[in-house]
């Protein structure tokens, strides 16, 4: 992939933050994106995607569109691809000028914000088809489905088999992941062996959405969360309660005990492949380069750690939606139903090297069939994935959590830092009337 999932994580919050500011100025439907109809009665529907420069995924999407256009004459879908770095701002600008396309892709965590801001329309009449997709690939808000994606990725641990074997460390499985105590003992043994510069690398040098995507699942495994998901009105008790404080102390101890660097190097994956690190916290996107490396036979892919409430990993990647102001919503929905056939889920996920969103599609993609070499990543996603908080306020929550987690790693008092984060998050939710 030209644009890796890790790179994509860096830009998630910007568009939602822009949507938040635009919606505050006047929430409502982004109408005005009329479908043009030619002399033969064929309506042209515009489709926007973030995949300019991401040749393999764009080619797969273009094939879906070509097949759809060739299957009927009532609608014609036209693709416009944007560079990822400018895509989100292009969407929010189009929403402000009421010129959104009928069909567009959207990053999963942004869906609640864009739906609340009036950008997106519910995918009415598609519930049965959507029910076959991994829950983390469906963008739902206020009880309605607004988006659905072809794929997801999974957070994993990559470990050197030799480091585990030489130190008598059990290889964990989905059914029996490492416990908190086992993980601590494993790190202590690896460090004591003196063979590794880093027993663990959590990629703390990464920026942006990586922090809430990668580290809030550990908070959730302890029993805390970023906000109370019952009503999304307050983070009190979730982000500053005993479980959250325990998470904060544990997270910082990984650095103070010398198990992982306070700030990882410029390329943690390469550090792992070069023998500097014994265990790398990474995503399923790291499997392909690991298997192509000189140490492929000494690498094992593991589930995340159970810190008390079961392993948790972040869920939700790019998804497809219909805009609220589309003048031919029946055409946009017709395309969506066609495009989400299992064969297209398979072709797009294969092109991107990601986890297919349906069981039938997974059976078509080499490696993701039951028992295939990548099937474990799909099982991790099925069993452990938790989508980020389904509230339009998520962008603020994400940046607040990032700052708080960084402050804690750098020595801030955990309780005080978490209490301040709760105050800030609650104030933001309340200032927006809890996005009601």
Residue ranges and their predicted role:
Residues 2-113, 128, 307-309, 330-331, ...:
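Conserved N-terminal structural module of periplasmic/extracytoplasmic solute-binding proteins
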Residues 50, 111, 214-217, 245-328:
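Extracytoplasmic/periplasmic substrate-binding proteins
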Residues 107-158, 211-214, 218, 300-302, ...:
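Hinge/lid segment of periplasmic solute-binding proteins
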Residues 121-135, 173-178, 198-209, 222-246, ...:
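Short, solvent-exposed loop/beta-turn-alpha elements that line the ligand-binding surface or hinge
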Residues 139, 302, 350-400, 432-436:
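Long, aromatic- and glycine/proline-rich binding clefts that accommodate carbohydrate-like moieties
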Residues 146-150, 155, 181-233, 277:
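Extracytoplasmic/periplasmic solute-binding protein
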Residues 165, 383-436:
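Conserved C-terminal helix/tail region of periplasmic/extracytoplasmic solute-binding proteins
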Residues 184-191, 229-262:
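Glycine-centered hinge/linker elements that transmit conformational signals in sensory
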